[in-house]
Amino acid sequence: MASKPEKRVASSVFITLAPPRRDVAVSEEVGQAACEARRARPWEMLPTKTPGAAVGRSPKTWTPSGKTNASLSGVTPQLSNGGCSLPPPSLNEEDLDLPPPPPPPSAYLPLPEEEPPVLPGKSLISDLEQLHLPPPPPPPPPQAPSKGSSVHPPPGHAIPSEEELPPPPEEPVTLPEREVSTDVCGFCHKPVSPRELAVEAMKRQYHAQCFTCRTCRRQLAGQRFYQKDGRPLCEPCYQDTLEKCGKCGEVVQEHVIRALGKAFHPPCFTCVTCARCISDESFALDSQNQVYCVADFYRKFAPVCSICENPIIPRDGKDAFKIECMGRNFHENCYRCEDCSVLLSVEPTDQGCYPLNDHLFCKPCHLKRSAAGCC
């Protein structure tokens, strides 16, 4: 009794294909990997014996619609990504009653069309226009980064090379103020550094240690000082250079009155007769250099006219002249002939004075008195 043939089911192998890529090198690697995988399965390359060969019909293989067995048997189909497709599995008699398997999916998957990227700002404006809302205000202009701050570009943006960047503007190198001092010390004639203590006095700059009294070398920084002949002096040394009062002997510091080659305090320069302060008025001196006011001096030392017996002094701002004759003093207006009262001249002429026995006469009266034997 013949044994019943065994049922054999050929297992089908499904290969999940990766989506195609644009990189040619990667596609070739995938095709080579698929071919190597096929070579690694020798059982698929061996011919399979169909147990139904004794029945008298050859098994039929399924072919896709629109293609014949002749076109499929002679050429091994290749995928678009460079891989090799597996041959269709062999079927037995029991498998012929099964419905044909669904057609395999297409190896080529079309790439979606690339759409231009939509900026978020334009999509936001279009949405606002549909809602009848005003568009947002434009973004502020980019501000130049401050010095010392680092700017990081957003991800996905390439940083331009150094050749593409514009050269930085050339800024003049400026030194801080007073770093290089042009002031020179008025005493040692060396530069005054801005970091050193300095004193400004008498329109010049000095080191603090150089601004001293020129007599006793006392430090004058922050102290009261005096200037004499362009030299700074402390108060004691300055007072030693001042003049002493010609009457009291004290130093004259404020207002000074100079007379007789000396200096006086205003209260010390007074008249010796009335003790009135003369100040800047006119004064007179006697033989002992004593000071008198003009009025007291004339009252004491002015000559007295022998005719009117009044002192001969200037009046109403006019100078007064005295005439001396025979040891007597006369005013100009009092110098007349005692007989005819004619004004006598001081010149030795006919209109001059012709005295006779201590009397003043003109020439005609003098001759008349002499002839008469009078006086």
From Swiss-Prot:
GO terms for cellular component: cell periphery; cytoplasm; fibrillar center; focal adhesion; stress fiber. Residues 278-375 are annotated as: FERMT2-binding. Pfam families: LIM. GO terms for biological process: cell-cell adhesion; regulation of cell shape; regulation of integrin activation. Its main location: other. Keywords: Cell adhesion, Cell junction, Cell shape, Cytoplasm, Cytoskeleton, LIM domain, Metal-binding, Repeat, Zinc. Interacts with FERMT2, FLNA, FLNB and FLNC. Interacts with NKX2-5. This is Filamin-binding LIM protein 1. It comes from Mus musculus (Mouse). The gene is Fblim1.
